[in-house]
């Protein structure tokens, strides 16, 4: 993952190249549930309340891939174009295999962000350490050349206080252990860690790479309580993590994540065993189609319209001569019924040549055919 200094230098270089304050960010969001994604979109909308479209009013899509674009204007005058790709995490599907194709289609000058959304209410926290490490290790394997800043953001983070107050297994000791474990892992993976209780919009803004002012950066950072934790990469240290609980064996865990993950699974209550067989998609994900194959067969559409118009004209000539219709045999009646059936199914076909020409012209203009 890119360091904070590398990300800053890259942003500065891009700004000098474009000679303006426009910033392009390509974000890949990983989350389990569309309700989680919808809540995160509310926070993104809050960065610039005047910007359109409102992501929160759209139907969020995760399977296999959802794609959204949003333009944001910050108070400092930055124009930020967010290209957001949403896919399920690796423990839910194999959509991550599409990542190289997704990143290849992003604007060349855009900075990259990988963001994992976790939900305190809708997910099993006992798997979080394993999931976080697994995702960011796999990202390096799938796309080793990509320099991207990584983040984890916990949504509904105030729910951890509810668990601490109402569940015997969620003691204050367990909460502190989880707090220190998450920050130790984030420090090891060189990623940022956010929550949404205190500064949801600022946390989302930082996670997706929208520039923060100096005052916003000071307001965002919080290292005291798990429900409020917001730690950007480069601002944390082992000494700061040790201040939460001095009994946390940092000297053991900092170089031994296997032991940390094992102890984490023992301390953090498991809600329900994960059935990997039922949640993982075993079918291979088809590669993204060639864009040329997505272009409509306009010539075929035009030929079909002319054929329908010919049938429509024949039908009008026949229906305007009732005496002739009465003399038509049963075979011709069946043929007439076929023509009428075609006409009924496409009543929007114009009745006159000028209207048809107008429709054809509209199709040609829409697809820019010369």
Curated annotation (Swiss-Prot):
Keyword Repeat part of the UniProt annotation: no
Alphabetized UniProt keyword annotations: Cytoplasm, Cytoskeleton, Dynein, Microtubule, Motor protein
Name of this chain's protein: Cytoplasmic dynein intermediate light chain DYN3
Role summary: Component of the cytoplasmic dynein which acts as a motor for the intracellular retrograde motility of vesicles and organelles along microtubules. May play an important role in the proper orientation of the mitotic spindle into the budding daughter cell yeast. Probably required for normal progression of the cell cycle.
Major localization listed first in the record, in broad terms: cytoplasm
Species of origin: Kluyveromyces lactis (strain ATCC 8585 / CBS 2359 / DSM 70799 / NBRC 1267 / NRRL Y-1140 / WM37) (Yeast)
Entry's localization field: Cytoplasm, Cytoskeleton
UniProt family annotation: Belongs to the dynein light intermediate chain DYN3 family.
GO cellular component labels: cytoplasm; dynein complex; microtubule
Subunit structure: The cytoplasmic dynein is composed of at least two heavy chains and a number of intermediate and light chains.
